[in-house]
A protein has these predicted regions:
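Conserved alpha/beta enzyme-core scaffold
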Residues: 1-165
């Protein structure tokens, strides 16, 4: 739909429209290892302009990037990322945007939220201010610009079949 001009990702899937736009030169693509991508976003949210990592040294990921040696090891310089919009889902949030995440959502949601110039959050449970204990808050509402309670949170589980029964 041509709503973005550049995709920075660790994996893009098998979307035919995305593939077509990339192959036609209509969409720029930058791959990053998943941990590096997460750290770039965390750094952006923390106001850190760049950092060094060994991940990607000697691969296509390193092409065109500054390198530096520390204690005999080569590192790549990665610039932090700040997005125009961060869209995050949380388990619970209050009306001021204080959020609680559950399980694997605790990994990347908070850093992604802080790296967005605008952060929109969909919560499973929207509660009143004060209903979340301060020690239970994973992301303070200062980072949240909009919050709403979502609907129909279906938890899909894949069923893997190895052989016929």
């Amino acid at each position: 739909t041509k709503q973005i001009k550049k995709m920075i990702s660790s994996y893009v899937g098998e979307n035919k429209l995305f593939e077509e736009q990339f192959l036609n030169g209509e969409l720029e693509l930058e791959f990053n290892p998943q941990g590096t991508l997460a750290e770039r976003c965390r750094a952006g949210g923390a106001g850190i302009p760049a950092f060094f990592t060994k991940t990607g040294v000697g691969t296509v990921i390193a092409e065109g990037k500054e390198t530096r040696d520390f204690d005999g090891e080569t590192y790549l310089m990665e610039h932090s990322l700040k997005g125009d919009l961060a869209v995050v889902t949380a388990w619970k949030g209050d009306k001021l945007g204080n959020l609680m995440f559950r399980k694997t959502a605790r990994n990347f949601n908070a850093p992604m939220a802080t790296a967005g110039k605008t952060c929109v959050v969909e919560v499973e449970n929207l509660v009143e201010v004060g209903d979340i204990e301060p020690d239970q808050i994973h992301l303070p509402g200062i980072y949240v610009d909009r919050i709403f309670e979502g609907q129909n949170f279906e938890k899909r589980i894949e069923r893997r079949t190895i052989r016929d029964s």
